[in-house]
């Protein structure tokens, strides 16, 4: 089961972009067991957070980038109740996808005739489908990345070891960053995103965008990168805004320069290997 089996509770037509965003939001929220909220715009997350309840998770996710969240698609991994529904409609959203909705929540949503509501049912039965893309004269098939890398299996390559709080943030960030368009950089504070830099042609530019989005909340946060840093500049830039720990795959010919930069800034550096971009053809 996947997006194709999700049911719509409204008759408003779904656009091509709507369906892609619903699918992207669903893929991210399925990474988490605890109550989690995801906000997606144009296939990229602009806010993700986990908490003890969905309302707190949603408000934390919104705080990442409220401007970009305007008109976004939201996903949840628990039933949406009335209090959450009231908070959602306080600003414009394009659509919501969740396992279920309380009767009161649906009544609240009915006041927004342009709001698209999708219900998935039990998420435990959902699995990601392979990705199929057309090429000139052929097709490219890639299996979905459903590998869950344990943070305990990662290698600490810096002099300083991570704190428990940093490990929590690094694990959270690693789960989300693989869903950000590459070059992808994500700043996280334990169980919420703080800044996201997506889709840039150079990794340092993605770091700068994440920095811009996170100020003034970046101090004491951690950074996740979907691929290795080809130069030390990404670490140097992150250190300027208070990043304390970094997770990345490693594998650059300049890995030692990157490690040296982390040590100079007293940043904890973890290598995962493989990259979340690795896949099977």
Predicted regions and their residues:
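Residue-level signal for inorganic ion chemistry
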Residues: 88, 238, 262
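C-terminal binding/interaction regions
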Residues: 94, 241-245, 250-270
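Short, glycine/polar-rich helix-capping loops at beta-to-alpha or helix-loop-helix junctions
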Residues: 84, 105, 233-234, 253-258
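Generic long, charged, amphipathic alpha-helical segments
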Residues: 200, 206-237
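Long, structured protein-protein interaction/assembly regions in large complexes
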Residues: 5-184, 190-193, 203-207, 212-217
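Short catalytic-loop micro-motif centered on adjacent basic/acidic residues
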Residues: 74-75, 95-97, 222-225, 245-248
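Single conserved hydrophobic/aromatic residue that forms the stacking wall/gate
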Residues: 1-7, 11, 271-281
């Amino acid at each position: 089961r996947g997006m194709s089996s999700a049911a719509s509770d409204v008759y408003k037509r779904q656009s091509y972009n709507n369906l892609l965003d619903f699918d992207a939001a669903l893929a991210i929220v399925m990474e988490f067991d605890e109550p989690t909220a995801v906000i997606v715009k144009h296939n990229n997350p602009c806010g993700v957070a986990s908490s003890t309840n969905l309302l707190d998770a949603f408000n934390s996710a919104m705080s990442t980038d409220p401007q970009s969240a305007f008109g976004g698609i939201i996903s949840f991994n628990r039933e949406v109740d009335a209090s959450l529904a009231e908070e959602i409609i306080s600003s414009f959203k394009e659509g919501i996808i969740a396992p279920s909705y309380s009767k009161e929540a649906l009544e609240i949503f009915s006041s927004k005739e342009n709001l698209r509501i999708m219900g998935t049912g039990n998420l435990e039965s959902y699995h990601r489908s392979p990705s199929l893309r057309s090429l000139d004269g052929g097709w490219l098939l890639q299996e979905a990345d459903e590998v869950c890398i344990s943070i305990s299996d990662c290698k600490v390559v810096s002099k300083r070891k991570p704190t428990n709080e940093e490990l929590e943030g690094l694990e959270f960030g690693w789960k989300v960053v693989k869903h950000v368009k590459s070059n992808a950089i994500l700043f996280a504070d334990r169980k919420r995103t703080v800044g996201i830099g997506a889709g840039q042609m150079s990794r340092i530019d993605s770091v700068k965008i994440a920095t811009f989005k996170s100020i003034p909340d970046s101090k004491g946060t951690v950074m996740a990168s979907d691929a290795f840093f080809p130069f030390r500049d990404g670490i140097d830039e992150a250190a300027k805004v208070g990043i304390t720990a970094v997770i990345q795959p490693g594998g650059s010919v300049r890995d030692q320069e990157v490690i040296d930069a982390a040590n100079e800034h007293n940043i904890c550096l973890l290598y995962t290997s493989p990259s979340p971009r690795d896949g099977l053809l």
